[in-house]
Amino acid sequence: MGAITLDGKATRDEIFVDLKERVAALTEQGRTPGLGTVLVGDDPGSQAYVRGKHSDCAKVGINSIRRDLPADISQAELDATIDELNANPECTGYIVQLPLPKHLDENAALERIDPGKDADGLHPTNLGRLVLNEPAPLPCTPRGIVHLLRRYEVEIAGAHVVVIGRGVTVGRPLGLLLTRRSENATVTLCHTATRHLPQFTREADIIVAAAGVPHMVTAEMVRPGAAVIDVGVSRDDNGKLVGDVAPDVWEVAGHVSPNPGGVGPLTRAFLLTNVVERAEALARG
């Protein structure tokens, strides 16, 4: 018997129904949320991501604010665009689409974002607030992972979660999220240089693979019945996009998130959620 599929697309659609109602209520008050994007250059992947985010906005009634800039823009011109969105009352939250061209300073750009308008939840100030368990926009992918597990009633409280990956977008903040009292998981943070990795994963109730190594998690590394979340994105030798979880894991695990179609749709859903939540907070005063 194969694993139960953790369906991110269906779960995203449920979130969108809720967001559409909340946005409609805000619009009645004259407070329609606005999501901004800053896209530099013409990278096809980045363009596709940005199009997808604005398509999502249209589905739930959020206003789209696009700032598409040429690849040869200067740091000063990029900074001016960020400052404009920080000051723009129509923009509730926004993102700077990465990667930026190599002549631009990504960290400087991200730190220039108003933390209150940080739709990704990855501003250093907001990550610090997560450490301190203070209210702040939450990182979208870790939030999506927790929501997906709860949607399918995978027990988190008391669970041993092994996270493979130490990046700032998933691995590090996910550990912070899962060890809050509201989640109460025990987290082991591993990575590509972890010795004897299978010894850790075989003890896990939940495995989150976010290392970007094709099919690194195999069936022999998974305890029967465990939940496995595949967040990794990389390309195999043929140039095909693949995740971190090998196909044979589906025969051993109790729950598996597909990739694509698992966590990715929820990352985008919680980008919108962060914007709507800020609009609601502003409406409350």
From Swiss-Prot:
One of its GO terms (cellular component) is cytosol. NADP(+) binds at residues 165-167, 192, 233. It catalyses: (6R)-5,10-methylene-5,6,7,8-tetrahydrofolate + NADP(+) = (6R)-5,10-methenyltetrahydrofolate + NADPH; (6R)-5,10-methenyltetrahydrofolate + H2O = (6R)-10-formyltetrahydrofolate + H(+). CDD domains: NAD_bind_m-THF_DH_Cyclohyd (cd01080). One of its GO terms (molecular function) is methylenetetrahydrofolate dehydrogenase (NADP+) activity. Pathway: One-carbon metabolism; tetrahydrofolate interconversion. Pfam families: THF_DHG_CYH, THF_DHG_CYH_C. InterPro entries: Aminoacid_DH-like_N_sf, NAD(P)-bd_dom_sf, THF_DH/CycHdrlase, THF_DH/CycHdrlase_cat_dom, THF_DH/CycHdrlase_NAD-bd_dom. GO terms for biological process: L-histidine biosynthetic process; methionine biosynthetic process; purine nucleotide biosynthetic process; tetrahydrofolate interconversion. Its EC number is 1.5.1.5, 3.5.4.9. Keywords: Amino-acid biosynthesis, Histidine biosynthesis, Hydrolase, Methionine biosynthesis, Multifunctional enzyme, NADP, One-carbon metabolism, Oxidoreductase, Purine biosynthesis. It comes from the Bacteria. Catalyzes the oxidation of 5,10-methylenetetrahydrofolate to 5,10-methenyltetrahydrofolate and then the hydrolysis of 5,10-methenyltetrahydrofolate to 10-formyltetrahydrofolate. HAMAP family: THF_DHG_CYH. PANTHER family: C-1-TETRAHYDROFOLATE SYNTHASE, CYTOPLASMIC, C-1-TETRAHYDROFOLATE SYNTHASE, CYTOPLASMIC-RELATED. Homodimer. Belongs to the tetrahydrofolate dehydrogenase/cyclohydrolase family. This is Bifunctional protein FolD. It comes from Mycobacterium sp. (strain MCS).
